[in-house]
Structures are given as C-alpha cells and as structure tokens.
Amino acid sequence: MRFILVSKYNSVNCENRKPRPSAVGRTNNKILTVKLLLTGSGGLIGSAVSEKLHGRGHELLKLVRRKSTDESELTWDPNHAGDLRDPRLNGLAGVIHLAGEPIAGIWSAAKKRRIHESRVRGSALLARSLAKLEQPPARLIIASGIGFYGDTGERKVDESEPNGEGFLAGVCRDWEAASGPARDAGIRVAIARFGIVLSGGGGALTAMLPPFRFGLGGIAGSGRQYMSWISLEDAARAVIHLLESESIRGPVNIVAPCPVTNAKFTLALGRELGRPTILPAPAFLLRRLPGGMADETILSSSRVVPGVLQGTGFEFEHPTVEEGLRNALK
C-alpha cells in the first residue's frame, strides 16, 4: 500500500538555508498520553525514541531479549515460531518495532543470515501476534531501510519507487512483507525506511570518525554516489510524527530533504572536524570487504527524498548535511 504524496517534492533550499526557530517537538497531530510497545529500545534510534516518548508522558512496554527486570519489560525471542502471549499486549495504542541485527560489521555468510532472519522473523512474530489480540493496537510502525530501492544512481526517488536489486533490497522487501498479518487485521501500518542516521554516539558516522579525526579521511570510490542521511534528532521526531498521524500508512522515507554526494559529505565532515580530507579510499580496495558490503553500502548511490514526511507537514530541525553533522558532533 503506497501513500499518496501531497506534492512531488516540496521545495527546500539545500544550499543557502537561513536560520529559523527550532522545530524540536513540533508535529502536526498530538495524541493523549497512551501505552505503547517498543522493540529495539537499546539501539541508537530506539534509545532516542524512548527518551522522547517518556518526555511526552507515554507509558512504555519494552520487548527485550534478556530477562526482564520489571513490569515495564517483556522478554521475547524474535525467532520464536509461535505467538507472543501476555495480557499486557492488549489495549496498546501503538507499537514501534525497531529491533534487528546491526548492518555494521563484517558481512560473513552468518552475519548476512542474521541480518535477514532477525528482521523478517521478528517482524512476522510481532505482526502475527498483534493481529490475534482481542484488543489490537490501532497503529504499528515497523522499521525498514532505504536499501529497499537498491542503487538508484543520480535519480531522485520517493516512496513510489519500486523494489530494487541486491542483498539489502531483498532483506527490506521480506522485512516489510512480514507485517502483512497486521495490515490484514486492520492495524494501520507505517513502514519507516531509514537512511544513514547521523549521531556521534553510534552508527555509520561513529565508524567514519577515527580516520577523519586524524586527517586520514577522504572520498570513497568516485565520490559521486549519493548518501541519503538524517540526524538522529530528526529520525526520532519522524517516528513520533508517524505515531501521532492518523493518516500515514505504507512506506515513509526517514531521510533529510537534502541528500548529498559522498564527496560533499566528506568535505562537510572534514570542515566540521577542522581536518583535511585528501586520502581517498579506492573502490577496488573497498570491494575487498566480504559479502559484497562495499557495493551495497559505501559505493551504492541513494538519492532518496522524504516525500511523505514533507507532504504531511513534518519540519526538519537539520535539513542540510552541515547542520546534521554539526548536531551529531556537538
């Protein structure tokens, strides 16, 4: 199911943006204090979302893989073949599913299998269980990634773009399809397709920082490939936006409105750190990473725009890469 965009691409000046008042905390539709279920609460995005939900006064029930420590946690095994059975799951206002094996790391055959299975099996278990509840939630937000589109070159793509090719495109396709039972049960499902989330506390940027801090950073490959990114602050706010909206369903690109080439990102990062960026990483060296990781991530071009977010009035706190990096590195 695809969301009908209000406009093809809302205009954003990505080069000469003037400062404006903070947009933090502003979304269009507010809901009352409610009880919510969250998975992946210990991850980069999950931690930020959890903090914002607590700040709004919402009651959180967290699904965790370890042994639960109090009534606010419920232990689960994403690989479980049955259903989740706990009376606390009834009457939830919404569910936010962010759990999954990290993409970062060496892509061995076992790692790639964990990336796929943790997402597909966990999502299927959750969707299946929610669909069978006597009082199912009204809304389910399930994470995915812009890897859904594959390598799209220099073309701007929004949520209407079809599924691409490659390992990550296949993972995202199966991941999103696993939410089918929830949709069939009448639950409003929004698919959050995350881009590169910029944070100094984890994720892709943290892995890039050591060489850049020592002045050893540079472009990857040709540097012409596009990177679709979003600040952690805006990513968490976007999840809240999906939760609080009564109309959004289907895929939603969680990216800033100003994707940049790897060359521009590299230059911006060097400027923020006050370091030179003159040592490139040739594509042939990057392709020595196992499992096709370089071609799927570092060298893949994704010029993805946030059509649904812009079409539903979401305001970005950090729309340009300079602002996103400055916020992440402060």
Enumerate the language-model features and the residues they cover.
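NAD(P)H-binding glycine-rich loop region in Rossmannoid oxidoreductase-like domains
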Residues: 68, 72-125
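Glycine/proline-rich active-site loop of Rossmann-fold NAD(P)-dependent oxidoreductases
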Residues: 173, 185-187, 198-207, 242-252
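N-terminal Rossmann NAD(P)H-binding glycine-rich loop of SDR-like oxidoreductase domains
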Residues: 36-56
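Alpha-helical substrate-binding/gating segment
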Residues: 209-217, 225-260
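Active-site Tyr-X1-5-Lys
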Residues: 165-189
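Conserved Rossmann-fold NAD(P)-dependent oxidoreductase catalytic core, especially the SDR/UDP-sugar
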Residues: 124-166
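C-terminal amphipathic/interface module of NAD(P)-dependent oxidoreductases
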Residues: 295-330
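Mid/C-terminal beta-alpha module of Rossmann-like enzyme folds, strongest
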Residues: 245-292, 326-330
